């Protein structure tokens, strides 16, 4: 310590000015040479990763941290600029382009940089090894001749491991034989390989009609039932645009979706089909939504060749555009603009952000190309009808006037052309002009009192085990039904708009994992959702959809029901309806969904069949339902009161005032709300008693026809069925039943 202190006592500070002047003169020489004090891009600096402890979790979506020393940060006109103090902070010449600009990096180095910061959750299975193979191949640029003999020995292995070298074009890949696709449209080997790998051997009707027209450059307005493959109907032409484009950087497709979950689903689907493109550039197809770091998204957008296809929600994309004029200029050159679930995007209250995006891009495109609008526009949805957006409770079904079916799409198109800048009149492709709900969906109805909705949900999932998706109009109903089913020992999960996006995705993953386990055990798995999951989401294996409440509009009913019977599979949609709903809203819904405008009489009222209900089984479930409902109400009321009290205390502490309990009674609404919740609470002894009683009932087997005598008596030997595991898994004496088979057989008998 003494030498250091002595050095300080000698005041060596002023002496350091001499080397400072020398370094200043040297820096002037470097400035003259164009090598120092230049504004550098963040990607040109030697960032070092910071290890994040595993005990800290994922920071709620935090992907990683990097740091750098010896770099000055300057803010000029609101923009952050980096200035390196010395050349050691810059990337080595091997990582930079051989030229004058240190910001531009060569394509190989850029891709190494991309993979360095990539989130491991985004990497598909088997992709890491493929990327490492690609990196080693790029390092040995001159080794093609030495390894040619080995490659000739196995052409198939060469196709798999070396196809992504830049010496080989994507179109040179071997195309699989898919005559159903190639006989009707001209597709590249890249797309054909993706279709073959995913098992899409035949195009759907909407794909068959849309893709050739889109490849020819037409604007398209496409309508098809849910689960019919609309994503690939617009996705394949966009992927073909990337392959045929020579610039290797210009954006090709811009796709907008109404929800974040749908945007991620579309992105994953396009990446699977265009796997060869993604392997060549992992960020050629990007998803830009809220709930994720906007700084990381801005950074990824700067990589060379990134964001050739962007799937985005309007809010986040608008935020990115308005922060950076270069992004506006860049995406103004886009070839194709797509609106998925266009009817939802263009409804009142959802169009403002999209309209601002169009204004930004239109102005930039007009300035650069001298044209106001020049991109190809494609819009798709399962519902294009002005009647669908009317509230079912607003107008009487008797006063409704339905336009002729041949003019319906024309009427909607006139409405859309006032909002969307088409180049001309788009082609209308309607694969189901008379059919609103997919033909694979068998609809059914349960009539009950409003207070018995929970009971009949329990009855349905008990009698028909499988994967069931229940839709509610209110978030409170979602929470209550979730607690109710948990009390009945049924695997239930919830998803609604009040949940964080991270928790929504976790809930979906847990539901799918539990569904696989319960399928082997023949037990029910239930996902309870608000309308956040109604549009576009492709949740695999949904067998039944239950409308806990009648939807507020017909388009919501169509999209809810479309979560089952995906990709030509079959499914069941059940509506639980109270007498009040049956009088008006249900009749209006059936009238809107009628097949033809000129249908005679009132046959449309009888199109939906009643689900057969067995009263003896319902009577055995009623007491269980009452106890589970009371416990669920108590749990939710207790949790809600605790949150209200904590919020009030926190607000009072922030304001520096005392909380007076009498203040709550002065507000009539708060007082009534609190009283209502207090009335639902159960004391500890009552709650414990209810739980014990409920557990005793759950341990008592349910018997068909309430049989409690000898198992070996009667027409069927129940003991033999139990030992051989015949019959229903939860109800003794009941045959295995399937809701779809039951409704099919009932419809056949009705036709006879």
From Swiss-Prot:
InterPro entries hit by this protein: DEAD/DEAH_box_helicase_dom, DEAD_box_RNA_helicase, Helicase_ATP-bd, Helicase_C-like, P-loop_NTPase, RNA-helicase_DEAD-box_CS, RNA_helicase_DEAD_Q_motif
Subcellular compartments: Nucleus, Nucleolus
Pfam families: DEAD, Helicase_C
An annotated GO BP: maturation of 5.8S rRNA from tricistronic rRNA transcript (SSU-rRNA, 5.8S rRNA, LSU-rRNA)
Ranges where the Helicase ATP-binding domain occurs: 211-402
Main location group: nucleus
Enzyme class: hydrolase
SUPFAM superfamilies: P-loop containing nucleoside triphosphate hydrolases
Record EC number: 3.6.4.13
Motif (DEAD box): 340-343
PROSITE patterns: DEAD_ATP_HELICASE (PS00039), HELICASE_ATP_BIND_1 (PS51192), HELICASE_CTER (PS51194), Q_MOTIF (PS51195)
Chain sites annotated for binding ATP: 224-231
Basic residues bias locations: 8-29
Record-linked CDD domains: DEADc_DDX24 (cd17946), SF2_C_DEAD (cd18787)
Single Gene Ontology MF annotation: RNA helicase activity
UniProt domain comment: The Q motif is unique to and characteristic of the DEAD box family of RNA helicases and controls ATP binding and hydrolysis.
Family stated for the protein in its record: Belongs to the DEAD box helicase family. DDX24/MAK5 subfamily.
Role according to the record: ATP-binding RNA helicase involved in the biogenesis of 60S ribosomal subunits and is required for the normal formation of 25S and 5.8S rRNAs.
Listed name of the protein: ATP-dependent RNA helicase MAK5
Originating species: Eremothecium gossypii (strain ATCC 10895 / CBS 109.51 / FGSC 9923 / NRRL Y-1056) (Yeast)
